[in-house]
Structures are given as C-alpha cells and as structure tokens.
C-alpha cells in the first residue's frame, strides 16, 4: 500500500473474521515494525506472542475491572482514567457497570495477541520528577506498537493498541513471567477485520495545530 493510504486507513480493529494470522505473516509484520525509533536507539521493546486460548481468556478477565471503570466514567461524562480531574464515580457505580464486550472480547476473538512491554532500565523518563503522570517513556515504545498496526494493515490485517491490562500489570507480569522492570505498554489483538474502514474521523489540522504558541493562530494554508 502507499504510505499515506496506510496511515489514513489504519483504525482500531476489534471485530475479526476468524482468518488466521500465520507465524510467517506475523514475523513479517514484526520484522518491519522493529525499525521504529526509540530513545538512544536502546530498543527496550519486547513482545510476547500469545496464541494459548487459556492465557488470552485470562487477559480478558484481568482487564474487566479497568473496563468497568472506563465505562462508568464515560457514562458519567468524565474522561475515563484521566489523571487531572478527580472522578465523581463511586466504587459502587463502577462495580455495578457491566464491561462492554468491545473492551474484553478482542483478546479471545482475534487470532493472536501481542503483549508489548518496555524495559524501564533503558528508557529516559525525563518527566519522572514532574508533578503529573509520566508520558515521556512512551516515546520509546509506542512508535513500535503503531508500526505493528501499520504493518498489519499493509498485510490485510488489523488490531488495536489496548492499555487496560496495564491496570493489572502485576498479574500480567506473573501470567507471562515478565520481570518487574518491564512495563506493560500495550496488549495488541490482531486478526483480519470484518470490515476495513477507509474514512476515519479525525480533527482537521486547523483544530489541533497553532502557530508559535498554544493559543496562537490556527495553522493552515490558503
């Protein structure tokens, strides 16, 4: 596929046909995705390929509490799991909220699941002392995760970068024998999408880019 077409049509695929993602195709996807950049080219990214139905079912079970909170906050008009605005949703509200299947089923309905982790010993977390949640570490892992989806799209497959499993990181680490210095960055289900979307809804450049400062004039061309 042409690069811009791939970028504009790679979406969060959660419904799959059941077609197999062979090891050969998966290897090709990862072989190309590995060229993503990382801080200092230290390449702290690691991947565990999961086909075992029992382990995939366990992932789906482990994300349920995070999915319930995500859904309850969304229904309350809050930004789910945001670290800025304190939630008004009670633990009772969260417990009473059923997790939507779209947040749990992809782990078992996809053909394969990738557990993407990053070695925090080699990541430059330059924002670690700021009074906010850290985001900089992601610069050394999420380009790789996105490359996986771009390569999957090129091969006719799709998936989505899910992060709910991070809320159960100790359990995920135990399930896959992951050392504690590795952070669970994403769990990516992969399969052939039931429907390939071609027109994605995204903000126009003028609504997300400004000139010179945050509240500057919108960036655009005549």
Where are these regions (language model features)?
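Small-aliphatic-rich amphipathic alpha-helix that forms the alpha element of a beta-alpha
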Residues: 29-33, 114-120, 127-174
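Short, basic and Ser/Thr-rich N-terminal targeting/leader segments
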Residues: 41-44, 108-110, 183
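Short acidic N-proximal helix/loop "leader" segments that mark the beginning
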Residues: 1-20, 24, 28
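Glycine-rich phosphate/pyrophosphate-binding beta-alpha loops
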Residues: 35-41
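Short proline/glycine-enriched turn/loop segments at secondary-structure junctions
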Residues: 173-180, 198-200
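Glycine/small-residue-rich phosphate/adenosyl-binding loop
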Residues: 49-139
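C-terminal helix-cap and adjacent tail motif
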Residues: 5-13, 85, 183-222
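Short catalytic-loop micro-motif centered on adjacent basic/acidic residues
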Residues: 15-16, 46, 158-162
């Amino acid at each position: 596929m042409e690069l811009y077409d791939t970028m504009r049509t790679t979406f969060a695929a959660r419904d799959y046909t059941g077609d197999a993602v062979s090891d050969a195709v998966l290897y090709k996807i990862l072989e190309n995705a590995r060229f993503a950049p990382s801080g200092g080219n230290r390449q702290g990214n690691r991947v565990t390929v999961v086909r075992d139905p029992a382990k995939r079912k366990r992932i789906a079970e482990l994300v349920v509490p995070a999915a319930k909170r995500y859904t309850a906050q969304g229904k309350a008009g809050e930004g789910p799991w945001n670290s800025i605005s304190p939630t008004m949703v009670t633990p009772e509200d969260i417990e009473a909220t059923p997790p939507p299947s779209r947040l749990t089923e992809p782990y078992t309905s996809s053909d394969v699941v990738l557990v993407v982790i990053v070695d925090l010993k080699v990541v430059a977390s330059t924002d670690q002392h700021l009074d906010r949640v850290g985001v900089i570490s992601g610069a050394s892992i999420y380009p790789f995760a996105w490359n996986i989806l771009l390569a999957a799209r090129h091969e006719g497959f799709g998936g989505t970068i899910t992060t709910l499993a991070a809320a159960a990181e100790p359990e995920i680490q135990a399930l896959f024998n992951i050392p504690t210095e590795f952070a669970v960055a994403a769990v990516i289900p992969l399969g052939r999408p039931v429907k390939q979307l071609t027109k994605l809804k995204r903000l126009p450049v003028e609504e997300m880019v400004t000139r010179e400062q945050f509240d500057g004039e919108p960036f655009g061309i005549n």
